[in-house]
């Protein structure tokens, strides 16, 4: 429970669904801008390219267990929660968001322009700040909400690659 693996605080289902949809839409907007800039680059979802339905089990395992769960445990579960015990939430959330953005930006820094790298850092950081806010202020400290949003976003990325949608 100290890391946020606990049930979501009682909120109206419609409110929770709105926060989840909002996070997913935020990611989708980001993805629509970034994908064309990184299309020719080998990414984590490149392995699914053109595989269609055959990739679905791999996409689900990758999206739910390999990426979103460990990242949510580390950034929102561990880092944010530990720092929020020692500083105001807004500072702790900003730090974890910057760390999350930097991690994702650094992965692309050697293969995209500096501008694209900063774009990736900024938007993944903004999404991370949103996820931290939703977890701590709307879901009672549970990371399940951000895990759902993050997993859905990664599933979308995998499906786009598998079915060559963009």
Residue ranges and their predicted role:
Residues 1-70, 85, 112, 116:
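Juxtamembrane helix-loop-helix connectors linking adjacent transmembrane helices
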Residues 16-21, 57-60, 90-95, 118-122, ...:
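Hydrophobic alpha-helical transmembrane segments
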Residues 24-33, 97-107, 151-159:
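Aromatic-anchored segments of alpha-helical transmembrane domains
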Residues 70-95, 135-141:
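Membrane-interface helix/loop boundary segments of multi-pass membrane proteins
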Residues 64-69, 73, 93, 101, ...:
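Short alpha-helical catalytic segment bearing the HExxH-like zincin motif
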């Amino acid at each position: 429970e100290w890391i946020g693996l606990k049930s979501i605080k009682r909120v109206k289902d419609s409110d929770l669904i709105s926060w989840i949809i909002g996070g997913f839409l935020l990611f989708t907007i980001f993805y629509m801008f970034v994908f064309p800039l990184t299309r020719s680059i080998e990414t984590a979802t490149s392995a699914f390219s053109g595989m269609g339905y055959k990739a679905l089990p791999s996409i689900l395992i990758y999206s739910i267990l390999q990426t979103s769960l460990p990242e949510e445990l580390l950034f929102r579960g561990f880092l944010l929660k530990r720092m929020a015990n020692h500083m105001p939430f807004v500072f702790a959330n900003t730090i974890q968001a910057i760390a999350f953005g930097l991690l994702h930006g650094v992965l692309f820094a050697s293969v995209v322009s500096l501008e694209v790298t900063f774009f990736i850092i900024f938007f993944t950081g903004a999404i991370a700040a949103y996820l931290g806010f939703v977890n701590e202020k709307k879901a009672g400290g549970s990371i399940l909400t951000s895990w759902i949003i993050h997993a859905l976003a990664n599933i979308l990325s995998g499906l786009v690659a598998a079915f060559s949608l963009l």
